[in-house]
């Protein structure tokens, strides 16, 4: 299998892009092989006309088919919470198909759930090297640097890289908006939340984020309006994955309502 990647999309590390004025092509090839570790023995890397070509040595069709069956089983094991079994299966898949981005990203997710942040980051870094347009890898990297490593500048770097390829992805925009709010860049956070809601009008996380932003910046009435709009759009029975954010939205509404009524009664 051959993979072609523009040099401009090569990331040399957290917050570091390929720079032709600083990095030679030989350095990039060495970096890529080092990033892939033991996998580099199964691949050839070359650069021509500003494009990296990675050629993976294909396994036999029988081995590939067996690996794909293991991938399906690994996903099932992970969904059922059998993380150690899923870990072994994903690794087994990647021994045969090292360029399988979905398997590698899922492996990173398992590492995250097991608390192995460094391994999760390593696998996601390879995902991005294989496919610089893999949206979920940028989201996960941004989340790692936001929640675990607490480096907001690097988190911003990954969200922005993701948005270069997927400017209208709702989850990327929402996570970036939350990061901007945490950094105190309220105007940009507001723009991002609103853009997300224009793209995904029934996305509870962005309603909650925007409402929280208005509360933090001293606009409780605007916050209440946003939450009321969410409640109108909210399905009668919230999906399980959205139930928590809906509950938080109701609690936030009650808190703001109580605060505004208290101020009104005082005056």
Predicted regions and their residues:
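Helix-start (N-cap) detector for alpha-helical repeat units in TPR-like alpha-solenoids
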Residues: 67, 101-102, 135-136, 170-171, ...
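Alpha-helical segment of the N-proximal tetratricopeptide repeat
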Residues: 63-102, 106-113
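Structural signature of tandem alpha-helical TPR/SEL1-like repeats
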Residues: 79-88, 113-126, 147-161, 183-195, ...
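TPR/TPR-like (Sel1-like) alpha-helical repeat modules
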Residues: 204, 208, 212-238
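Long, contiguous interaction/recruitment modules in multidomain scaffold/adaptor proteins
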Residues: 1-69, 79-80, 85-88
């Amino acid at each position: 299998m051959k993979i072609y990647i523009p040099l401009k999309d090569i990331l040399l590390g957290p917050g570091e892009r390929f720079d032709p004025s600083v990095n030679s092509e030989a350095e990039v090839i060495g970096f890529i092989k080092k990033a892939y570790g033991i996998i580099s023995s199964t691949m050839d890397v070359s650069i021509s006309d500003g494009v990296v070509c990675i050629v993976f040595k294909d396994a036999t069709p029988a081995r590939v088919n067996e690996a794909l069956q293991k991938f399906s089983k690994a996903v099932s094991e992970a969904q059922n919470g059998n993380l150690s079994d899923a870990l072994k299966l994903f690794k087994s898949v990647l021994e045969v198909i090292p360029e399988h981005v979905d398997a590698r990203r899922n492996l990173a997710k398992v590492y995250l759930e097991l608390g192995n942040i460094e391994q999760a980051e390593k696998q996601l870094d390879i995902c991005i090297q294989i496919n610089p347009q893999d949206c979920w890898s940028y989201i996960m990297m941004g989340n790692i640097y936001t929640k675990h490593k607490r480096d907001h500048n690097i988190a911003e770097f990954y969200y922005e890289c993701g948005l270069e390829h997927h400017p209208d992805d709702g989850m990327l925009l929402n996570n970036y908006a939350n990061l901007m709010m945490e950094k105190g860049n309220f105007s940009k956070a507001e723009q991002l939340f609103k853009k997300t809601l224009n793209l995904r009008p029934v996305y509870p996380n962005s309603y909650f984020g925007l409402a929280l932003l208005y509360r933090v910046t001293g606009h409780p009435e605007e916050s209440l309006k946003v939450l009321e709009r969410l409640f109108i759009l909210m399905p009668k029975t919230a999906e399980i994955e959205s139930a928590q954010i809906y509950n938080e939205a109701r609690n936030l509404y009650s808190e703001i309502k109580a605060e505004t009524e208290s101020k009104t009664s005082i005056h």
